[in-house]
Amino acid sequence: MTPLNNDRFLRALLRQPVDVTPVWMMRQAGRYLPEYRATRARAGDFMGLCTNPELACEVTLQPLERYPLDAAILFSDILTIPDAMGLGLYFETGEGPKFHKAVRTEADVNALKVINPEQDLPYVVNAVKTIRRELNGRVPLIGFSGSPWTLATYMIEGGSSRDFRRAKEMLYNQPEVMHRLLDVLAESVIVYLNAQIRAGAQAVQIFDTWGGALSHNAYREFSLKYMEKIVAGLIGEHEGRQVPVILFTKGGGQWLDAMADTGATALGLDWTTDIAAARARVGNRVALQGNMDPGILYASPERIRAEVGNILAAYGQGSGHIFNLGHGITPEVDPEHAGAFIRAVHDLSAQYHTAG
């Protein structure tokens, strides 16, 4: 395989010395970029973009043409797994993802089978291969999946939800059915991420977008337990390198100690967590990724730069920090402001790294 020209993202994940703090953005290939909107229009719709490996590759690389990012992330959607299970994913303008079929009963759960990524999601596997080839060693490629709990919420609700009423009804009234659903999803995530790794992903992230909606005990039983199972089932080394695993629970700051015990390489932090306190708690066990409020990108470039400086200072000296937003970049952000953010990370972080 082509050697990496820039491996600081992988080095920081392993808490090895770097010259500057690496940076990438969740949803860095997205609607804030005019070139993304043009490619999406050519694809016809969002699913047309996701299911075309060449176009998925094109939009994955677009932010790297604009910005000195330290990683690329596969362009896809977390809901590909339930779609592959036959639920019929579609998107309604202004309403987000929906499924033609929801999972509401024990019979619905029992009918689900663990996916076969090469057969059921060949467009994802082919997109990873295509992106990796086109990157040609420029930066590492991140693969990803949704967490079992997060996938389950969409499957049970039939789409997005504010209160997760149906999902919580199943969780509390039929916990054994919920566990069965989460188990088939965990097994599916394992084979899905391993397929991405074999196709060329050099690190993977598990997005637990809705873990923070759970109570303290329910989070451990219905979300964290399954992410720990996934981490244990992943390919640990590929192409002669360790394959780092990033766990990101939005709203999960109170569970960092338990998350660090899963065997994950790094934990994603949202912007409600104090990164200095997080490093003091778990920084000797895991790298940390985050955690600027995406809303700051609406402010002036000077204010963005100041906030980057604040977060770098809070993390402090040494490696083990991957700079990111605390959640995905939003569609209305000025691309120039995103550029100011990325440049500020590299400009201001060198002082915190004595070896490179």
Swiss-Prot record:
<keyword id="KW-0963">Cytoplasm</keyword>
<comment type="subunit">
    <text>Homodimer.</text>
</comment>
<keyword id="KW-0456">Lyase</keyword>
<comment type="pathway">
    <text>Porphyrin-containing compound metabolism; protoporphyrin-IX biosynthesis; coproporphyrinogen-III from 5-aminolevulinate: step 4/4.</text>
</comment>
<feature type="binding site">
    <location>
        <position position="77"/>
    </location>
    <ligand>
        <name>substrate</name>
    </ligand>
</feature>
<feature type="binding site">
    <location>
        <begin position="27"/>
        <end position="31"/>
    </location>
    <ligand>
        <name>substrate</name>
    </ligand>
</feature>
<dbReference type="GO" id="GO:0019353">
    <property type="term" value="P:protoporphyrinogen IX biosynthetic process from glutamate"/>
</dbReference>
<protein>
    <recommendedName>
        <fullName>Uroporphyrinogen decarboxylase</fullName>
        <ecNumber>4.1.1.37</ecNumber>
    </recommendedName>
</protein>
<dbReference type="Pfam" id="PF01208">
    <property type="entry name" value="URO-D"/>
</dbReference>
<comment type="similarity">
    <text>Belongs to the uroporphyrinogen decarboxylase family.</text>
</comment>
<dbReference type="InterPro" id="IPR006361">
    <property type="entry name" value="Uroporphyrinogen_deCO2ase_HemE"/>
</dbReference>
<feature type="binding site">
    <location>
        <position position="209"/>
    </location>
    <ligand>
        <name>substrate</name>
    </ligand>
</feature>
<dbReference type="GO" id="GO:0005829">
    <property type="term" value="C:cytosol"/>
</dbReference>
<feature type="site" description="Transition state stabilizer">
    <location>
        <position position="77"/>
    </location>
</feature>
<dbReference type="InterPro" id="IPR038071">
    <property type="entry name" value="UROD/MetE-like_sf"/>
</dbReference>
<feature type="binding site">
    <location>
        <position position="327"/>
    </location>
    <ligand>
        <name>substrate</name>
    </ligand>
</feature>
<dbReference type="GO" id="GO:0004853">
    <property type="term" value="F:uroporphyrinogen decarboxylase activity"/>
</dbReference>
<feature type="binding site">
    <location>
        <position position="154"/>
    </location>
    <ligand>
        <name>substrate</name>
    </ligand>
</feature>
<comment type="function">
    <text>Catalyzes the decarboxylation of four acetate groups of uroporphyrinogen-III to yield coproporphyrinogen-III.</text>
</comment>
<keyword id="KW-0627">Porphyrin biosynthesis</keyword>
<keyword id="KW-0210">Decarboxylase</keyword>
<dbReference type="InterPro" id="IPR000257">
    <property type="entry name" value="Uroporphyrinogen_deCOase"/>
</dbReference>
